[in-house]
């Protein structure tokens, strides 16, 4: 079976692993997944990540918990292959009044909505995390 939306698969694996209280989740690696994992790490939603293997690289994400509860309460895919969501810098969404983040793919790389506003660029809204 071919994977139609690898990023949605990544987010689902993270969500399922946190519900099962796993400490680490692994998945096939890609450039986009590593960029999203870097943003999640920089924002403090995951403890860490690493890419293992040469021929078929695997991305391992170390999940983060606070007082026994997952740090990521909600993660949603916004732009999907069947309906891409592109937003200008003025239209970038705020998640829960600025408490969460939107992860945006811009021509300057994958970044949070706050960083995109600061850089003055819009792009494809990949997902929201709270």
UniProtKB/Swiss-Prot annotation:
Entry's Gene Ontology BP terms: translation
UniProt xrefs under Gene3D superfamilies: 3.30.1370.30, 3.30.1490.10
GO molecular function: rRNA binding; structural constituent of ribosome
GO cellular component assignments: ribonucleoprotein complex; ribosome
Pfam hit, one: Ribosomal_S8
Domain of life of the source: Bacteria
Record key words, sorted: Ribonucleoprotein, Ribosomal protein, RNA-binding, rRNA-binding
Subunit details: Part of the 30S ribosomal subunit. Contacts proteins S5 and S12.
Family label: Belongs to the universal ribosomal protein uS8 family.
Protein purpose: One of the primary rRNA binding proteins, it binds directly to 16S rRNA central domain where it helps coordinate assembly of the platform of the 30S subunit.
NCBIfam families: PRK00136.1
UniProt name for this protein: Small ribosomal subunit protein uS8
Native organism: Ectopseudomonas mendocina (strain ymp)
